[in-house]
Amino acid sequence: MSVVLQKIWRRLALLESPLEKLRKLHLRLRGAVIGKGTRIPRVLVTWPHQIQLGRDCTLQPDIFFNYSHFWMPGPSMIFGDRVFIGRGCEFNIREKIILGDDCLIASGCTFVDSNHGTDALRPMNAQHIETAPIVLGRNVWLGAQCVVLKGVQIGDGAIVGAGSVLTKSVPAGEMWAGVPARRIRPVTTHA
């Protein structure tokens, strides 16, 4: 393909399709807050009024926002500005999930801010549900297929390796990886 055609193709890809505009209108009419310049492809949202997306966010297709509680005033899922969410991510929200500005969430990541209890004397489907918010600071990068569990807070500038399971909070400026995730080293700066 010629260089000219490649440039034209790249510019066309930046245009918002009529279907994407209709999707945004539908979500807004149902209570979602969507910042200017945010791209919304094919996503599934159970309670749109629980979603607040900042400016210039990019969401890839097949993202699932599941607010698993009775109807409550929102929002419970708050994205900052310039957040990128990769294909196939899942947000299971019962309390609150907050992503700071400039976060990069690679494809296939899962966020779960609740958990069933573990009382051996009660059936699993009758257990008390424990919840705690998930909060990511600014400029956080999660590699592909990470799982972030209830109560986890990730500090500004932290990096989490692909396939990690986060069961505890990550301090700012650190790199973590593994199952369960543990500290690898500080994030370095390059001049």
Predicted regions and their residues:
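Flexible, glycine/small-residue-enriched loop-and-beta-strand segment within the central core
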Residues: 44-152, 179, 187-188
